[in-house]
């Protein structure tokens, strides 16, 4: 598996010829020129996870890509987007993508909770090779190989980020959702996630593929 981080929550996961793109949002960059995608998967409707301005060009460049999103986002986007519900299993070539979670993390009690689908990607070697939770602290209750773990968010304290990484306890983790933090300050968050957990924590270089 190869992972490429395009900033914030946008990840490209490549399994041989099968290429999955998660959450191409407004805080992400460099995904515009990607071609050959097998699927585009959206966790939820917030703009930092789906940039509706740049999305049409991405779809034009990837006419064969299957398009999946949480039910609320799929309803907003319309056809050909498909709604993904908790419990769904999406067969994508040699992969199986499972939909789990269902709800966005609480930002404030007065702000309505929207839908959020977390994705578990399984290959021939691991049932949960990769997990992309979106904006949620969902614990799948099974061993995850690589977790794309939220590093910072308006809905999360650093203590909660540490506790989440401890709870999932993946073999490896890469941070996402860090665009809201100034680049010079991100080391504070990464340091806590590295020092206070036993997970192999690796910061991905932006727009460069890393093999796992």
Swiss-Prot record:
SUPFAM superfamilies membership? Metallo-hydrolase/oxidoreductase
Q: Which domain of life is it from?
A: Bacteria
**Which SMART domains does the entry link to?**
Lactamase_B (SM00849)
UniProt-listed InterPro entries: Metallo-B-lactamas, RibonucZ/Hydroxyglut_hydro, UPF0173_UPF0282_UlaG_hydrolase
The record's section on PANTHER family has:
UPF0173 METAL-DEPENDENT HYDROLASE MJ1163 (PTHR43546:SF3), UPF0173 METAL-DEPENDENT HYDROLASE MJ1163-RELATED (PTHR43546)
This chain belongs to which protein, by name? Protein Rv0786c
Q: What is the lineage of its organism?
A: Bacteria, Bacillati, Actinomycetota, Actinomycetes, Mycobacteriales
């Amino acid at each position: 598996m190869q992972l490429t981080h395009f900033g914030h929550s946008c990840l490209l996961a490549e399994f041989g010829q099968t290429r999955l793109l998660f959450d191409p949002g407004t805080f992400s960059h460099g995904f515009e020129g990607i071609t050959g995608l097998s699927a585009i998967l959206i966790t939820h409707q917030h703009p930092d996870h789906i940039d509706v301005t740049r999305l049409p060009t991405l779809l034009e460049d990837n006419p064969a890509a299957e398009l999946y999103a949480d039910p609320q986002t799929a309803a907003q986007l319309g056809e050909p987007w498909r709604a993904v519900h908790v419990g769904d299993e999406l067969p994508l070539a040699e992969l199986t993508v499972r939909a789990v979670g269902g709800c966005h993390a609480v930002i404030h009690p007065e702000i309505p909770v929207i839908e959020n689908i977390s994705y578990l990607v399984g290959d021939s070697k691991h049932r949960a090779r990769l997990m992309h939770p979106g904006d949620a602290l969902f614990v799948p209750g099974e061993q995850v190989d690589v977790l794309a773990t939220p590093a910072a968010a308006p809905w999360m304290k650093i203590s909660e980020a540490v506790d989440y990484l401890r709870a999932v306890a993946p073999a490896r983790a890469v941070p996402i959702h860090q665009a809201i933090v100034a680049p010079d300050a991100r080391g504070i968050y990464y340091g806590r996630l590295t020092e206070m957990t036993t997970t192999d924590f690796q910061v991905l270089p932006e727009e460069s593929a890393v093999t796992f």
